[in-house]
Design a protein with these regions (language model features):
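N-terminal small/glycine-rich loop or linker at the start of catalytic domains
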Residues: 50-55, 124-148, 260-272, 340
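C-terminal functional extensions of proteins
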Residues: 280, 294-295, 301, 611-689
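Long, compositionally biased, glycine/small-hydrophobic-enriched stretches that function as flexible linkers
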Residues: 1-126, 437-452
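N-terminal low-complexity, intrinsically disordered segments
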Residues: 117-119, 139, 458-536
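Glycine-rich, proline-tolerant flexible connector loops at the mouths of alpha/beta enzymes
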Residues: 95-98, 108-112, 171-189, 304-317, ...
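Alpha-helix-loop-beta-strand connector modules within alpha/beta enzyme cores
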Residues: 118-122, 136-137, 142, 182-210, ...
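Flexible, glycine/charged-enriched surface loops at secondary-structure junctions
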Residues: 200-203, 297-302, 335-337, 405-408, ...
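Catalytic alpha/beta core domains of metabolic enzymes, predominantly
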Residues: 216-375, 379-387, 396
Length: 689
């Protein structure tokens, strides 16, 4: 780490994630670093390459040399003074392409929360549109996020329609697919397209797969908006999509619109930070987005997912608020139309009431263009808390802002939008009629209402209106917190794995495991030796590992229906599968990599409980091929093993990805790993996914 990078990380307001790159809890050290940072000139910062990679090259290319020359003499303190002055908004609009991404990071580091809020509330980057447009000063919109743990079309459709009834979705309908194969992407793109076109909605739609798979899907269906997660280093981007910035630039022009997601913490928790702090990495991601927009001229939005990872990044509501303010200001300084996903995982310790209060504060202080909107406060597929449909009418009233004029007019025409969100059945009838259904409107409304009731009975947060007594999120939160402390059922383990070895991670107890994730990534020294002694002769090609993860209930509920079937399929295919499975208490995903390094296994299949909060206890399987293309072990250090080298099969549950389908998928993927001698993004690339 060079001196400038060190000054940048020490100048940050404290967040746990920065401890990975040299951050400190010491207030005195941080104050001194902010003083040193304030005295630096923008020219000094612009000359420094924080990382030698394509992201840095992209940041240089995004700058206008003439404008950069005009601001090079300014110190970071000068920039702060200008931005907070009455002329600040006009000044940055004229000079933004001369201000480097790292300079944007520097200036927010030396601002208080109050100063960040003052600045954010006078910076707006609207997209084209008549009347109140996305990102304009009077606008506050949303992305409907209609996720389904099994990609069920009725669940997705009814979730969208109820969201529309609350006035949500004016920015985009954006679905995270539970299964990320191209066929599923095509099917879901067509569903979203049918909603937009049948109801003649003035909004966009997107299935949030990566831009490579979307490009493949686009040859068979309309993909309205291209999606990609961005990051502040090439290493992080390559780990997500096996493309660097130039690869993204090659694919982006194929889409009429672009939607990027970012968020502090992803690079530092995946060993891809390159010694750069979280705020600066986030600013660098915005610089990449700026370059792509400059080169494509596309309609573009960015969404900062703040709070999605867990307590290893943010532990308190104050940190979440700070991150949202920092990120919104930095994005606006780049000229980006910026939204937020103000969210919390169930193991952070931020409860539903606190998150609602934080959301209100952030909407007022950060003035984002939009937030997420889900059927209930808990996403039924991703397992975290965010903003519900029901909150949006209240947030619009509190801020005095509204959805786009075009969307408001269309929802009025459809007689759809109410404060209580109770007209989803009417929208269902209109949707069916537009698709050619000849039944009466009353019949269709009754059918829509019945489907909503059925989904509610199955646990979906639909059809309740704004009933103040509806407390399902409280129950989900309580159950999720309880699930974090669940233990593995020995009967389930014995039934699923008659021969197994019980191992322990280095977590002292469950609280240590939750608070310090790294302790769950390595096996204890005593158990390491025992694992290495399990196979004195021939070691298996495929080693099965089982960990409780964040939810042992997921193992207890699903393992019996998956592990024996996977073993049968692999043995039938002629693979040498472990006679002794390794079961880890307080195990994280990387604990599976550690087992791989101890046994030099060719393939690790690691079954682990997904984090709770979806309303169902879902299981994941992480499949990792441990040899390189020369047949040499790539396991190395478990702590440094790249997550991009693994392939995940997620959402395994009878109400998500059915166990029998998961068994088939795991067996098929393992066969492809042996054939291609790789896994993760390399396997996707080899298979043209």
């Amino acid at each position: 780490m060079n001196q400038l990078s060190q000054t940048f990380v020490l100048a940050n307001e404290f967040k746990e994630g920065d401890l990975n790159v040299g951050g400190t809890r010491d207030d005195h050290v941080r104050r001194e670093a902010r003083g040193a940072l304030a005295a630096l000139s923008l020219g000094e910062i612009a000359k420094a390459d924080f990382v030698e990679d394509q992201v840095t090259e992209a940041l240089h290319r995004s700058l206008d040399p003439q404008l950069a020359g005009k601001v090079t003499h300014l110190t970071v303190a000068d920039l702060k003074q200008i931005l907070l002055s009455p002329e600040g908004a006009g000044w940055i609009e004229r000079h933004r392409n001369g201000v480097s991404s790292e300079a944007a990071a520097a200036v927010v580091k030396i601002m208080t929360n109050e100063e960040l809020a003052t600045l954010s509330c006078k910076l707006f980057n609207p997209l084209p549109g008549d009347g109140i447009a996305i990102g304009s000063q009077g606008h506050f919109g949303s992305r409907i996020q209609p996720n389904s743990p099994g990609d069920d079309e009725d669940e997705i459709l009814l979730s969208i329609l109820e969201g529309l009834a609350y006035g949500c979705g004016d920015v985009i309908l954006g679905l995270n697919p539970a299964s990320d194969d191209v066929d599923t992407i095509i099917r879901l793109e067509r569903l979203l397209q049918s909603v937009v076109e049948r109801l003649e909605l003035p909004t966009r739609f997107c299935v949030l797969s990566d831009i490579v798979k979307q490009t493949t899907a686009r040859s068979q269906t309309k993909a309205d908006v291209g999606f990609q997660s961005l990051a502040g280093t090439s290493k992080a981007i390559l780990g997500m999509v096996a493309l660097d910035v130039d690869g993204l630039l090659a694919l982006a022009p194929g889409f009429d619109g672009l939607y990027f997601e970012t968020g502090q913490g992803s690079a530092v928790t995946n060993q891809a930070a390159e010694d750069v702090d979280m705020v600066t990495l986030e600013a660098r991601a915005y610089g990449v987005a700026r370059l792509i927009q400059q080169q494509t001229g596309s309609w573009m939005i960015v969404n900062d997912v703040a709070g999605f990872i867990g307590p290893e990044v943010f532990r308190t509501g104050e940190q979440l608020l700070r991150a949202c303010l920092e990120d919104t200001v930095m994005a606006k300084l780049h000229g980006i139309t910026m939204g937020l996903d103000v969210c919390a995982t169930f193991h952070m310790g931020i409860g539903p009431a606190e998150l609602r209060t934080l959301t209100e504060q952030i909407v007022v202080q950060a003035a984002p263009a939009y937030l997420m909107a889900v059927a209930g406060n808990a996403d039924p597929m991703l397992g975290y808390m965010t903003t519900s449909f029901r909150e949006h009418p209240r947030l619009r009233r509190q801020t005095g802002r509204q959805i786009t004029s075009a969307m408001q007019q269309r929802l009025i025409e459809l007689s759809a939008m109410t404060e209580s969100g109770t007209n989803a059945d009417a929208l269902y009838a209109a949707y069916q009629k537009a698709g050619g259904d000849t039944r009466s409107l009353d019949t269709l409304r009754d059918e829509g209402a019945k489907k909503i009731r059925t989904l509610a009975e199955r646990g979906f947060d639909l059809g309740y209106g704004c009933d103040e007594n509806h407390t399902r999120i409280t129950g989900i939160y309580t159950n999720a917190r309880r699930a974090l402390y669940a233990t593995l059922d020995e009967a389930v383990i014995s039934d699923s794995s008659p021969r197994h070895f019980r191992a322990h991670s280095r977590s002292l107890d469950r609280d240590d495991f939750l608070a310090h994730p790294a302790t769950g990534e390595l096996i204890t020294g005593e158990d390491m030796a025992r694992i290495q002694a399990l196979y004195p002769a021939r070691r298996p090609q495929v080693q099965v590992v089982v960990s409780d993860g964040l939810n042992a209930n997921a193992i207890n509920e699903n393992l019996r229906w998956v592990l024996p079937g996977v073993r049968r399929e692999l043995l039938a295919a002629g693979h040498h599968v472990s006679e002794i499975d390794i079961v880890i208490e307080n195990g994280r995903v990387r604990a599976g990599y550690h087992v791989g390094s101890l046994l030099e296994a060719e393939v690790i299949i690691h079954f682990i409980g997904e984090r709770p909060g979806t309303g169902i206890d879902t299981l994941s399987a992480y499949l990792t091929y441990g040899l390189d293309d020369k047949g040499q072990s790539r396991w190395g250090s478990a702590a440094g093993f790249d997550h991009s080298w693994t392939t995940a099969v997620c959402g395994i549950h009878r109400r998500g990805k059915p166990p029998e389908r998961a068994v088939e998928e795991i067996a098929r993927l393992v066969a492809r790993m042996f054939a291609q001698r790789c896994s993760g993004v390399a396997l996707q690339s080899a298979l043209g996914w």
